[in-house]
Every structure is written in C-alpha cells, then in structure tokens.
C-alpha cells in the first residue's frame, strides 16, 4: 500500500511542497527567509485578528480603543506590540529576502520574481494602512501626506484623492475603509504567496553557486525542515526580545498623541521601513517627479532580470559586482537615515546624491560591471 501522503489529494500537495520536495544540497541560511516570511504572515494575521476583535474604526474611539486593548484586555499589550514589531520583523525579512535574490540571481525565475515584487507592494500598502489605524498624530498626518501625493497625477489627481479619502480630508470614511483594506489584504498576500511558491516549485530553488543543481538534490524533509525550525526559533527570540524589552524602539513617540487636524507635527515621517523610499521622494523638488521616483524605487526591481548582462547567474564569483552590491546596501542604509532627518542642509544634498546613486547603481553601473567581468573571463 502506498503512503497516504503520496496519494491523498490534499496531502499530496503538502508532500510535494514541504516533504519530498527535491532541494539543492548547498543552499545557505539566506534561503531561510522565505519560511520566516510565512511565519511573519501567520503571526500578523493571528495577532491582527485578535486586535480587530477589540478595535473600533471610528475617529472618535479608534485611539481610545487601542489604549483599551493595551490596558484592559488580557495580554492586549502583548498582542498589540507583537503586531507592531511583527511588522518590523516582516520588513527586515523581506529586505533580506530581496537582497538574497539580487545577490544570487534568483530574479532569473521571472514569474516568481514578478509575483515577489507584487507581494512587496501589497505588504507595503498593508503596513501603511495599518499605521493609520491607531489614529495618533503620525497616523493622521502620514495618511494625509502620502494619500495627498496622488493629487500629483495629472487631470484625475485631485478627484482620485477625494475618492480615496471619501470626503474632503482624511476622516471617518478614510479610517473605516483603511481598516477594511488592512483586514483583507493579508489574505490576498497569503494567496499570492501560494502562487509565488507554485512558480518556484515549477523551476526548483536557486543555490549560492547559481549553477544547475539537478545532479545533487536532497529531500526537503528532514534536512531543511530542521534548518527552517532553527531559523524560526531565532526569529521568535529576536521578536519576543524586542516586544518585551523595548517595544517602542522602532515606533514614533508622536503616535501616542491623539490625531489633531489643527496641529501638524514638526517632522512628519513614516515607519522606519519606508524611510528609504521617503528619502527618494523628498529628494526631488517636483511633486509628480517625486511620486514617480517613489514608485520606481520599488518598481525598479521588476527591471532587474532584463538588466542582467553577466554570463554567470550568481554574484558568488564576481568580485566587482559584489562591491557594487554592498555599495547599494550602504546607499539604502544612508537613504533610511536621511528619510528620518529634517529637510535642511546637509541632509538635502546627501539625500539627493544617495537617490541618484541608487538608480545609477541598479540601472547603469551593475549591468556595465557585469559586461566587464564577462571580458575578464577571457583572460
């Protein structure tokens, strides 16, 4: 009699995805972030569900309902901070996952990569709307500033903004619809992640060398299940340490002040994981130009497979490309720092230079360097 996990229609899918899946024998810990992102999504959906049971999406009561969760609900403070810091962990894992894909040439799996870019946009949209829900000062003004950017779109801009707001300013209608979208999007993300995996399993995983690994495959279970569990344990350790010791480390103190449309905070800034894109937005004096640069800062990832000029897939054996990759990482950290600084000298010029370098590296320098390395192979 054949094993049930190999014959049962549902078990068969699980078996082919997580048990008998042939995986390259040499994939490093950088391949752990896919499973960690799955854990992040599960943590966010569960904590979010319990928060939604006590939250009210009304401008009059939203702030006090969050306070009520933290003070009166059993372990409400824990659920709230797990959700808030879980979002930060989500983005740390996302950035590392994308970075891994860039370094090792995983973007050559076109469908998987494009759905990944779509997932990144969806997670960013979800996080932005979630930040609006506590209805603190930074929630309100962040929502006002970012949604107002759509007014830069020619002809339909101002109508589009009023349509999204559900009125002439960010108000009750905006908060209610943001709550509805914030609730539904994670389930759409989960479905997209399933498609992401589906396309990945069509080709099989990439590996650090970037070479075909068909000749040397091992079963996913037990080798990579145990490896993923180790990653998950470390993830839980970091998340719980953050939640229990310094839950407000990555948040903004302004969000502990209830939203006041009559009082603008001195520095409006988003959560830390959007600061690099925010710095790129601010570095362009023109409003429409800034919005285009903001969108392109993420959308540029979709162009990367077409800018791959190297004969080798991975950067493992390409020292010049490695240098440029780490310059790109440093540049993104610089942009993140600049995004949190006030708009004044010398931060303006640093932000503009870092923004130019960001696009220059991805669109020009990396493809040219790859061509140079191809010629070096002939020596």
UniProtKB/Swiss-Prot annotation:
Entry keyword Cytoplasm: no
**Residue sites binding heme b b566 per the record:** 97, 196
Its cofactor is: heme b
Q: Copy out the cofactor comment.
A: Binds 2 heme b groups non-covalently.
What does the UniProt keyword field contain?
A: Electron transport, Heme, Iron, Membrane, Metal-binding, Mitochondrion, Mitochondrion inner membrane, Respiratory chain, Transmembrane, Transmembrane helix, Transport, Ubiquinone
Can you tell me which residues bind a ubiquinone? 201
* Topological relation to the membrane, as annotated: Multi-pass membrane protein
Q: Which residues cross the membrane?
A: 33-53, 77-98, 113-133, 178-198, 226-246, 288-308, 320-340, 347-367
Which InterPro entries does the record cross-reference, listed alphabetically?
Answer: Cyt_b/b6_C, Cyt_b/b6_C_sf, Cyt_b/b6_N, Cytb/b6-like_sf, Cytochrome_b, Cytochrome_b_C_euk/bac, Cytochrome_b_N_euk/bac, Di-haem_cyt_TM
What GO CC terms are in its UniProt record? Answer: mitochondrial inner membrane; respiratory chain complex III
> Which Pfam family is one of those matched by this entry?
Cytochrom_B_C
Family annotation (Gene3D superfamilies): Cytochrome Bc1 Complex, Chain C
Described function: Component of the ubiquinol-cytochrome c reductase complex (complex III or cytochrome b-c1 complex) that is part of the mitochondrial respiratory chain. The b-c1 complex mediates electron transfer from ubiquinol to cytochrome c. Contributes to the generation of a proton gradient across the mitochondrial membrane that is then used for ATP synthesis.
What else the UniProt entry mentions is: Heme 1 (or BL or b562) is low-potential and absorbs at about 562 nm, and heme 2 (or BH or b566) is high-potential and absorbs at about 566 nm.
Listed under subunit, the entry gives: The cytochrome bc1 complex contains 11 subunits: 3 respiratory subunits (MT-CYB, CYC1 and UQCRFS1), 2 core proteins (UQCRC1 and UQCRC2) and 6 low-molecular weight proteins (UQCRH/QCR6, UQCRB/QCR7, UQCRQ/QCR8, UQCR10/QCR9, UQCR11/QCR10 and a cleavage product of UQCRFS1). This cytochrome bc1 complex then forms a dimer.
Full protein name: Cytochrome b
User: Source species, please?
Assistant: Sorex palustris
Gene name as annotated: MT-CYB
